[in-house]
Amino acid sequence: EQVERRCKAYTADAHRTHLVQPGMVYISQTTEVGTLYTKAEVKALHDVCKKYGLLLFLDGARLGYAVESPGNDLKLEDLPHLCDVFTIGGTKQGALFGEAAVIVDEELKREFPYHIKQRGALLAKGWLLGIQYETLFTDNLYFRLARHAADLAVKMHKGFKEAGFYFLHNHETNQQLPIFTQTQFDKLKEKGFYFDHFADMKDGRIVTRFCTSWATDPANVDRLLEAIKDL
């Protein structure tokens, strides 16, 4: 609805030639606050984009974590039917570096190699990207690593709720955003835990961020959940 309102406002503006011409809608899965787009929501965005001649780009830096999260209904195999371009994250999901760009739109496919070259993104040893993904997609490793993070996120979410904490968003993806008082925040820092001061609330409380990943040690999650019990 937001995208359609923007598009309608743009096309109705008699002075639109003085504005930036819209060309693409960008979303990420998961989002920067750990929320998920549903399949129906992405389908709705796709339909609006087609209606107004826009491309739909999905940033999948955390795509594996999204796919393996409880309640997610947007699968990897759905994306070529709903997006013009999407990425399959590597850097945040076990690869040494790099992202895999999946281009569905045929016109973009023809132009993309030239954009890579012109913007300094062409690696002399590009096979180093390919071999990482070949390994990650062997024996379902990519999704097994993501499932590890998802399982620990569920455990963390449950532990925070049982300790009486509220969340900025109530979800179970690998980014958890529990809300702390300043005193709770300071006490947990003193216990030696590192976590993000994500945002400040109007009432003085602090939104924090804890992330799980393919490399998270379950023992560290246990230590954290034990530590928050007496905050």
How would you name each of these model-derived features?
Residues T31, R62-G64, K92, T216:
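Active-site-proximal loop/turn and secondary-structure-junction residues that shape catalytic pockets
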Residues A40-D47, K51, R62-V85:
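Active-site pre-lysine segment of PLP-dependent enzymes
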Residues E1-K8, K39, K43, E134, ...:
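Amphipathic, non-transmembrane alpha-helical secondary structure
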Residues Q2-G60:
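Active-site phosphate-binding strand-loop segment of PLP-dependent enzymes
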Residues V154, G159-K229:
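Conserved C-terminal alpha-helix-loop-beta "cap" of PLP-dependent enzymes
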Residues Q21-M24, S28-T31, L36, D73-T173:
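Active-site C-terminal subdomain of aminotransferase-like
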Residues E41-L45, K75, L79-L82, L152, ...:
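A general structural detector for well-ordered alpha-helical segments in enzyme core domains, enriched
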